[in-house]
Curated annotation (Swiss-Prot):
The lineage of its organism: Eukaryota, Metazoa, Ecdysozoa, Arthropoda, Hexapoda. Required for maturation of ribosomal RNAs and formation of the large ribosomal subunit. This is Ribosome biogenesis protein WDR12 homolog. Belongs to the WD repeat WDR12/YTM1 family. GO terms for biological process: maturation of 5.8S rRNA from tricistronic rRNA transcript (SSU-rRNA, 5.8S rRNA, LSU-rRNA); maturation of LSU-rRNA from tricistronic rRNA transcript (SSU-rRNA, 5.8S rRNA, LSU-rRNA). It comes from Drosophila grimshawi. It comes from the Eukaryota. WD repeats lie at residues 103-141, 142-184, 191-230, 249-287, 289-328, 334-374, 378-416.
Amino acid sequence: MEAENGEGQVQVHLKTKQEHYAVPDVPYAIEGSVSTTELNIFLNALLQNKGAASVDFDFLVFDEYLRGRLCDHLREKAISFEDAIEIEYVERFPAPEPQDCLLHDDWVSAVKASGKWILTGCYDNTINIWTNKGKHILTIPGHTAPIKAVDWLSLDEVNGRFVSTSQDQTAMLWQWNIDSNAVDCVSVCKGHERSVDSVAVSPDAQRFATGSWDTMLKLWSAELEDAVEGSAKRAKESGVRTPKMTLQGHRESISAVQWMDGTTLLTGSWDHTLKVWDLNLEGIKTEISTNKSIFDANFSKLNRLIVTASADKNLRLYDPRTNQGSVVRNTYLGHNAWVQTVMWSTTEEFLFVSGSYDNQNKLWDCRSPKAPLYDLLGHGEKVLDIDWSNPKYIVSGGADNTVRVFKSRKATVDHMETK
């Protein structure tokens, strides 16, 4: 058929879940050579007949974003050009805007945003607290080696509590009085024998988990008044805290740890595996083998999928629920060097961000494996950590001694819905 060469026409149905942008459900004849640009012109012409303003859309054809000509996309999917093709369109997620550059004295290896605050960890052994408007609030010494990870335990108008981990083999629990801007180290957590590279706080904020270069996964109490008995009394009095549980199973460094729920942990490792741990059973529930060292891994509570960052420039998508969990659901191409860090959006089901040794952050839709939605530029050296915990801000730290803050501008459609 001529359409296969991009010269003929294809019958399509245009569908959307965003009802305020719906067009009549009738077949439309369009050129097989169309791309997203031409489809946007065609669709907006239909919508303008309804009095709508011009809108940028992305187009899903058989569950994947169209990133070239329609005829090439159909051929790649082995879809018959004789059939009527259903194309789903969605309002394009707007490009995040660069907002701030927070200058530090050394590499920024850890970032975590919550509310109006940004917590950062540096290679000069310090932790820093900033506002999301770029004002520096506090520099916190205490560790004796570079910081590797940070996470908030709790945060309200009066107090903030957080945990930091370091190459000095410890985790530290901190209490910050926001009014007086004073911070105290509540406990030093000792038990790892190498650098503590990852940390995650439980959903109820009563515990936290750490992953280390010593291959061990450890669980700790995060409570201020942690009851200790017998021989551990002296440790309590000195402010030293010991692990509640140690889980062995990885063969190399644990680079990522995350709570999937209150009793389940996800870890990623340089040993090429993802492991899902059942804390009630104190053992491994699921293991996913990959073909590369995992530098970071993140689980989405919205879509239940895991995305990984690896040494071969690619990001990969896995489904831990299937018997074929080790089968890669998708591979995302776009970075030009090691991908160091990755995180799902906490509010947008299909979106995630990544940071790489190519000095770039990228914003992805998991349905678009061939190209990211946007490049988030600004870093002058490799990106070491990225965070999208606060839906309004994408925050990244790098070897250029800066934190870059990008404001996420979600598309506003409320005015359309009320018309």
